Amino acid sequence: MGKIIGIDLGTTNSCVAVMEAGEPKVITNSEGNRTTPSVVALTEGGDRLVGQTAKRQAITNPENTVFGVKRLIGRKFDSPQIQGDKKVLPYKIEASANGDTRINLRGKQHSPAEISSFILANIKKTAEDYLGEEVTEAVITVPAYFNDSQRQATKDAGKIAGLTVKRIINEPTAASLAYGLDKKGEEKIVVFDLGGGTFDVSVLEIGDGVFEVKSTNGDTHLGGEDFDLRIIDYIADEFKKSQGIDIRGDKMALQRLKEAAEKAKMELSSAVETDINLPFITADASGPKHLDVKLTRAKLESLVADLLDNLVAPCKTALKDAGLTSSDINEVVLVGGMTRMPAVQERVEKIFSKKPHKGVNPDEVVAMGAAIQAGVLQGDVHDVLLLDVTPLSLGIETLGGVMTKLIDKNTTIPTKKSQVFSTAADSQPAVSIHVLQGEREMAAGNKTLGQFELTDLPPAPRGVPQIEVTFDIDANGIVHVAAKDKATGKEQSIRITAASGLSEEEIKKMVNDAELHADEDKKKHELVDAKNTAESLIHQTEKTLKEHGDKVDAATKTAIEAACEELKKVKEGTDAAIIKEKSEALTQASHKLAEAMYQQAAQESGQTEGAAQDPKGAAQDDDVVDADFEEVKDHKK
């Protein structure tokens, strides 16, 4: 049985870990890094790049380099979050036929789940290279405040990447596993997780291997990307003041600004001031323009003051929902790269009236927790019980457009709950079940997860039929809904997938495309290897001919030169088999030259040995030799 890996699929960076000798171990990628940028690019030549290689070329290929896709996953195109992102992202965001979000790369639409699958496939390969075996199963983390469609889309991404997702686990919960695995006493902790694109806060009780989530809250569209945007706007405004040019319309310049903003933000976690220098950022009639802006930590904090304020309410709500106060909390664990920012740490200390715990690596702790959960599922980790909760209330729309809740937020999962409803009109032949997720009283203010109908109801006065609606949330936080007419036993059910926008057929096609792409990658690799071998062979043959061509007859030399020319003609082509065939032909033709060289070397070696033996051969008088020898011996005596 292969290993189940733990994956933190992050907005900015992703990380993978596995259980080894009872401990979670983070796996380094091919470049020796412990995290991989969550960036995907499509080059002009049609090559797909993932990770650091994609990030490196972002400045020259901004429209076809996707970052922060986690903020788009499972969302409709007309949602305010997508409409806001559309204005600031350099790549094209479009609507699909059913209103879902799509990313256009070089004329082809991709779903956010598909883009995420490219990142997961890259991580899968990293794990396989390390483990030396195929990896087919994973535990993947998501923000605790992800709704059903976002969870389902993440699961779809895993499937497209060739992974069976054994469990979707909340990021703060995963972090608590890594933090508290060895803790013996009971503790009440808060996991404060501010990452690249999302914010979560969870309150947990941990002790003796039991990890019970009491409440969770957050914002799935608040993170480091938002802080970066504030810095980008500030730099662009300062440049416009000094040069009179707004560089935000230049996508290449904007990408340079993004990188500079990210770097400045990181530097200001340890320094109080930084210089942002971008030479040749743009040009006008007077010549090239250079950007040079100073940014202080105090200025940065003023730029993001409202974002820092937005961290407070979810924390207060989470404490209230858990029935606790800040004085009840033993530790506040910081997770996510953004928690390195001093202003964030100060705000956390102010909210919870205690200094936060910094003993875990905020970039790796979530992946390590996912690996521990993978170990639990695999049977390698014992005495660990994880009790997570659903982050949002679930219900259906009832008469008057009201949302009637069946499962309240922060209910421990898995869970199942039923409630009986009836018809609103006489002889109503069908009922429409509108499944909702959210906290608003009216249906219109909540997220639609899906709709289905229970039909062929027998004619009856209003209020008489008994329709039992059952909500079932599995351990992944994914919802299943069923409706049953108690009189006839007729039942209709739905596994909520509509909002993720990917049907089983679409997922199957993407899986096939991913497998095809893997084959294409293999073929490209073979072609590159064949070309490199051919190049090396041509160079070596021409060098050898130049130095030793006179050692073979004219016919052999001509045959070698002809084979060399044949290989030169095909080596720039795209058929690896033909290049290999012509390389083999040149190798065979060159054998005669090699034989001639060795024969000549052997002859020369033989002549040298013969010349060394001649003096001995000439002096065949044994007595003379003995006498000389004896004389020396006598003299010595």
Curated annotation (Swiss-Prot):
One of its GO terms (molecular function) is unfolded protein binding. The modification Phosphothreonine is found at T198. Residues 597-637 are annotated as: Disordered. InterPro entries: ATPase_NBD, Chaperone_DnaK, Heat_shock_70_CS, HSP70_C_sf, HSP70_peptide-bd_sf, Hsp_70_fam. It comes from the Bacteria. The keyword Transcription regulation does not apply. SUPFAM superfamilies: Actin-like ATPase domain (SSF53067), Heat shock protein 70kD (HSP70), C-terminal subdomain (SSF100934), Heat shock protein 70kD (HSP70), peptide-binding domain (SSF100920). Residues 600-610 have a biased composition (Polar residues). Residues 620-629 have a biased composition (Acidic residues). Acts as a chaperone. HAMAP family: DnaK. NCBIfam families: PRK00290.1 (NF001413), PRK05183.1 (NF003520), prok_dnaK (TIGR02350). Belongs to the heat shock protein 70 family. This is Chaperone protein DnaK. It comes from Desulforapulum autotrophicum (strain ATCC 43914 / DSM 3382 / VKM B-1955 / HRM2) (Desulfobacterium autotrophicum). The gene is dnaK.
